[in-house]
Amino acid sequence: MAPKAEKKPAAKKPAEEEPAAEKAEKTPAGKKPKAEKRLPAGKSAAKEGGDKKGKKKAKKSVETYKIYIFKVLKQVHPDIGISSKAMSIMNSFINDIFEKLAGEAAKLARYNKKPTITSREIQTSVRLVLPGELAKHAVSEGTKAVTKFTSS
């Protein structure tokens, strides 16, 4: 058997020769190292740094009912404004109601084994989802809107 080579302990480098990366990793006992800024997957430092050569990311369009809420508000009360928080609440309210109506209309179409949601399913779902007098007004306004749309 060949004799094993003796392992000599690695000589300690002087402090000034120690790379900056190693210094950053060493932290005092008991403290967590600071989190480094990480880029999302698929993004390079050149794009993040404001390099003009990279492609601009297209803005995702977000559809809201804010302009329509504002138009209705001005029809009903021309002298009253609305705060952005109240507008956001109204937008969420309309999204919730439409989601309930669409879900109910989908159920009705499924029950009747129809592949299509028609104005009849929407009208029935309005009667089921909205209470009493509100449902009557909604049905009459909806019928009026559909008639106006089909006549033009």
UniProtKB/Swiss-Prot annotation:
Sequence similarity: Belongs to the histone H2B family.
Other notes: Phosphorylation of H2B was not detected.
Protein name in the entry: Histone H2B.1
Comp. bias intervals (Basic and acidic residues): 1-28
GO cellular-component term (any): nucleus
Phylogenetic placement of the source organism: Eukaryota, Viridiplantae, Streptophyta, Embryophyta, Tracheophyta
Chief subcellular location: nucleus
Modification after translation: Can be acetylated to form H2BK6ac and H2BK33ac.
UniProt keywords, alphabetically: Acetylation, Chromosome, DNA-binding, Isopeptide bond, Nucleosome core, Nucleus, Ubl conjugation
Subcellular location: Nucleus; Chromosome
Glycyl lysine isopeptide (Lys-Gly) (interchain with G-Cter in ubiquitin) crosslink location in chain: K148
Subunit structure of this chain's protein: The nucleosome is a histone octamer containing two molecules each of H2A, H2B, H3 and H4 assembled in one H3-H4 heterotetramer and two H2A-H2B heterodimers. The octamer wraps approximately 147 bp of DNA.
PANTHER family the UniProt entry points to: HISTONE H2B (PTHR23428)
Stored PROSITE patterns: HISTONE_H2B
Sequence segments annotated as region (Disordered): 1-60
UniProt modified residues of type N6-acetyllysine: K7, K37
Pfam family of the protein (one): Histone
GO molecular function, one term: structural constituent of chromatin
